[in-house]
Amino acid sequence: MKLTERKKMILIHIAWILALAVILWPLFTIAKYDYPSADDWSFGKYMYRAMQAGEGIAGVFHAIYQTLAQNVWEARFSILILSALQPAAFGEHFYRITPYLMIGSVILSQFLLLRECIAGQAKENRWLILPIGIPMAILQVLYCPYPEESFYWYNGSVNYTFVYSLSLVLLTLYLEIALRETGKAKRVVLTVLACLLAILVGGNNFSTSVSTMCLLICLQILFLICRKDAFRRTWIVTLLETLSVLMCVTSPLTATRLNGNFGGSTANSPLMAIWLSLERTFLNIISWTNLKVLLLLVLLIPFFWKAVRKMSYEFRFPGLFTALTFGVYASQATATIYVDGTMGGGRQGAILWYFYVLWMVANVLYWCGWITKRDAIAVKAEKADLLAGKYLLRYSTCLLYTSPS
């Protein structure tokens, strides 16, 4: 029986969903043993007292205010806000939702970004979101360098893994506001949400906040040159994110923490930190680009090919795209290299890994788009689609027979 294109994609979806379920099942099974530790207690104490006193929603906001007001150490205000919402403050048994929240946020935020990027103008590409997004998520979760800090410890994971996810949602809203024609009311709602996320992301860990700032500024410059209407719609989002970062950097509490932990001195000058972040990020990429990553990219290329064929983007200057995305990615390491000379470990190493997979996929997708838009390749479109169709048939059949029953 000959399979139609729709049936092939259904089989691929089923196979990948089963694979994701198999990967996540043991990670979620041990969640019942998860328990608060370290900073969970200190940041969650006001919320715990409010819940014990039965203060309700008003108590939640008052506890967040107290956490901010009593702080004498942490300049990154978003860390204080998110840390105050520690699940065990509402009941110890709630702490087990931490890995569900963190892993779920990574997966769902990437689905949203993929939907915006590949299916925003080509609705038929919605069938490609899961076949591209699930393998990415499996690789990110399965090979996360520090899963205990990134998925199971609330205070660490919410300010790194979860904020990584918030940055992707922010980017999704940003692109939706900039590139899509929507009603005025919807655009206002999306802009307000994007502004709130910009403040939260900008006021959190410097790896995510600085790289997001660099990315938004690059997009803002591009819009100023090519799409002034998009620039007018989005400049406020970029401004708020940048101001949040600068507020954290220039806060007296940052100097207090620097004095307390490092004697008031830094390991490198700003220029040296930028140079070292480029150098070490390049070495990091080389060390991470192994057989499993290359295999993932090879498996995804047919789906990339099908996606970009239906997209209206021109995919110009792929070399410049790669250079800029490398610079944005490298900016994640600049803050820690500046302060203590390291790339950062633990939960920060995890978000470096998440972004590595994301940017690798984005670059291969972009280069595929550039190739398909070239005239020399465009005349062979029917042959390319036929090859892609044959690959999808074999791929779906293989996954169907190798997936767990």
Where does each model-flagged region fall?
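Start-transfer (signal-anchor) and selected internal transmembrane alpha helices
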Residues: 1-24, 398
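Transmembrane catalytic cores of multi-pass membrane glycosyltransferases
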Residues: 28-97, 154, 204-351
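Membrane-interface micro-motifs in multi-pass membrane enzymes
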Residues: 39, 129-175, 205, 330-365
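Transmembrane-helix motifs of polytopic, lipid-linked glycan transferases
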Residues: 97, 101-126, 169
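Membrane-interface transmembrane helices that cradle and orient dolichyl/undecaprenyl
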Residues: 167-189
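Membrane-interface alpha helices of multi-pass inner-membrane proteins
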Residues: 189-212
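Signature aromatic-anchored transmembrane alpha helix within multi-pass, membrane-resident enzymes
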Residues: 242, 321-322, 370-400
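Conserved small/polar residues in nucleotide/adenosyl-binding loops
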Residues: 401-405
